[in-house]
Amino acid sequence: MYSLMHRDEPVCAITIDTVSGAIMRVSRPVNPELLPLGGCIDSAALKKWWQHRAVPIGQGKIQRILEQLGITTPQEYLVRNLGLSLTDHYWIKPLDMELGWGDINLFTNDFRDPVGDMQLGQDVNEILELPANAFSPSSSVQGELKKKWIITDGKRCLIKGNHGSNSQESLNEIVATLLHKKQGKQPFVTYNTIRFDNTQPIYCVCESFTSDELELIPAIDIVDSKKKNNAVSYYEHFIAVCVAHGMAEEAVRSFLEYQILTDFILTNTDRHLNNFGVLRNTKTLEFVSMAPIFDSGNSMFWQNPKLPKRDDLTKIDVNSFRRKEMQLLVYVTDKSAVDLSLLPTCDELREIYEKDPLIPCLDSILLGYQKKIELL
């Protein structure tokens, strides 16, 4: 038996299957206001929330790594790490152990990430077991790309890899950082390049924007926390829930419109509802602000570097509030939210991408970038 905890406050008792790591039974919450926002409707939703909290089995080499370590499922690995995350302040407490948030949280306690080491290059066969009583954030890190958490100068930083042999996705994050820095209008995560040796691709690294005071509530949890009227779009529903939690409607709208416009310019096709959200005060549960823009790697035609025709540039599929990129522009009421005169030049982007000579069709990528700007 475990208690689902939010910091040092119990939320509800849960029974977890010792083999699969799945939640089998959920008791009546003792503090229902502390339930995870997206898992507060019923026990089935909480079980689903727990399942989605675990590292995806398709992330990098995670399946092979877990097999090597004798771990059956990602949820079992999550249980071994007490459900801890560097995204929020939820965890599970064994009922027979005296533990507190201060003893185990990853924000103020040092940790190592041996699974992350294996994800980013160390031979999987070199790690035969994980250190006992040492918790790691790798059991709850999300996304398909291989990742590793490190602590540098006391800061929690995430290193992120790429699909395939070139470094375009990591360099896309550098491009997005430059764009947002030059605009200076909305909060964003700063990415830098990192390389372990010349035999490996360029990776990107960023500092965590959560802390022991602030946690991320993903947009998917926000829209799922309240029943949506069928006549209302998910976009408007998200805004309405944020406003109901005390956020200023104008601030939410201006952020979303800026994000839509910059994603359009960068051809970021993967702004799904786990890739943006709200920062919440972990003690008062107040919605403080929109989380800074992060995760723009799936952009700049990275899956199709050969320049599509102009007509094709208006038919790009996306994973977001709408299925087509052009449809998202309908939500934008103020295109001056982005200053086109301050966008990075093609020469600036070329300098970034030329760090990796393996990136194909660079001229076509830059031409596509120019044409997308012209569409605005």
What is the predicted function of each stretch?
Residues 1-261, 265-267, 278-376:
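Phosphate/dinucleotide-binding and metal-coordinating scaffold of catalytic cores
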Residues 272-277:
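Canonical protein kinase catalytic loop motif
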